[in-house]
């Protein structure tokens, strides 16, 4: 075992003395050492319950003959970080989490790992670490929050942000805003729609790194505790069989994940995270393949913000395996791939029925014949940009309107809230990309303000930043190349007509090649906004959104 270097032989006596200082017995040192990566903290609602999940994992590991040892990972709440400087520190934690987990796992020679994440950057960061370290690993998330209720109807955090927009527009009272505030987030857990955290937890299950229910069993259900115990037991089986992350997360597994991404209507952030995880496995996952997969993958789920169903409803309808079984009626999945269950994808999903065709549409009656995400290209985004097609109203799938250009989120939000944005406009927010932000902030406040003012079906928003999974409407992000490196989004001017055709996968601003060349010749790079600390280092190394905003290591 890997841990033999710290537990066996006379040369390891110093290490054993330190393990003894932890209270470990000789018997415990003779067992496999299983690291449990706990992301518990008291500031993230999706992580406040993870101490209970971790305790259940420890019990499972012990029952199966291992020695569980807990160490921490950080986590940021994107909702709390939203709309201020703190959002610059969200995406960047993905790489901090991967780096620090790699360091802990390698320094202490663990034999296996159980990852206990839940929220947005925590899940992909730990998947990246799992791919790097490549020792037997399993994931068990903290689970989704239950939906809230306002006026007797289910609702969630996306409605809360939109309520702020409605309040600023004078459409609701302060009392109604307070009602939303006190009711949309009723429990612990990751926010209740198909937002980024739940998207990644569901895709972890699809990749084969989490057991059935990992993405959908609510945080407050006892079944979640049982799942954690099973994960603790299962890791010992994976260790015995020497099944490792790179055995599970193959290229075909990522194709399955992309297919299910389209079927579920996941967050556009998945188009950042899946390529980043694949990069750690050792291959390039080009986002261009999304359109090829989308063209043959029907969208079967309209979970919030695209619709009025929630992760708890998906769980009741049969969960991720039921959606996989439904989509595979078209033969779209690779079913011979090994997973953390020790079985193949096909064996896992066999017999998993769709219990509610209103939540999981049958393949013969999908929400749309194409998938939930589209990748667009054109002179505004020569490399690519992405949009959650399933959350766009039909009339906005094709739109042409004048640009209203802003160089930061705050200026755009002020313009929206003061009525300077009108029906037909295309809001452009730039210099918010991975380098330019730095940190590629989410534009949930502007999109929510647009929706809250009743403009969601008539105004588009384009950015080199990104979007929360809670954003809806014609919200087009990850524009690459970004403005900070001279991408064409930096050359757009107020009043330029912008043409968007999501069904045709195109996005252009209507200026001549000669005018574009003139503007490019006059463009000058801006000084970095931040020159010290982690963000400065991140900005120096980070790549474009179309590459997953991975860090580019200089070659020596």
Curated annotation (Swiss-Prot):
SUPFAM superfamilies: IlvD/EDD N-terminal domain-like, LeuD/IlvD-like. Pathway: Amino-acid biosynthesis; L-isoleucine biosynthesis; L-isoleucine from 2-oxobutanoate: step 3/4; Amino-acid biosynthesis; L-valine biosynthesis; L-valine from pyruvate: step 3/4. Belongs to the IlvD/Edd family. PROSITE patterns: ILVD_EDD_1, ILVD_EDD_2. The modification N6-carboxylysine is found at residue 121. This is Dihydroxy-acid dehydratase. Keywords: 2Fe-2S, Amino-acid biosynthesis, Branched-chain amino acid biosynthesis, Iron, Iron-sulfur, Lyase, Magnesium, Metal-binding. It catalyses: (2R)-2,3-dihydroxy-3-methylbutanoate = 3-methyl-2-oxobutanoate + H2O; (2R,3R)-2,3-dihydroxy-3-methylpentanoate = (S)-3-methyl-2-oxopentanoate + H2O. Homodimer. Pfam families: ILV_EDD_C (PF24877), ILVD_EDD_N (PF00920). It is an enzyme of class 4 (lyase). It comes from Clostridium beijerinckii (strain ATCC 51743 / NCIMB 8052). Binds 1 [2Fe-2S] cluster per subunit. This cluster acts as a Lewis acid cofactor. The active site is at residue 468. The keyword Lyase applies. InterPro entries: Dihydro-acid_dehy_C, DihydroxyA_deHydtase, DiOHA_6PGluconate_deHydtase_CS, ILV_EDD_C, ILV_EDD_N, IlvD/EDD_N. [2Fe-2S] cluster binds at residues 119, 191. One of its GO terms (molecular function) is dihydroxy-acid dehydratase activity. HAMAP family: IlvD. The gene is ilvD.
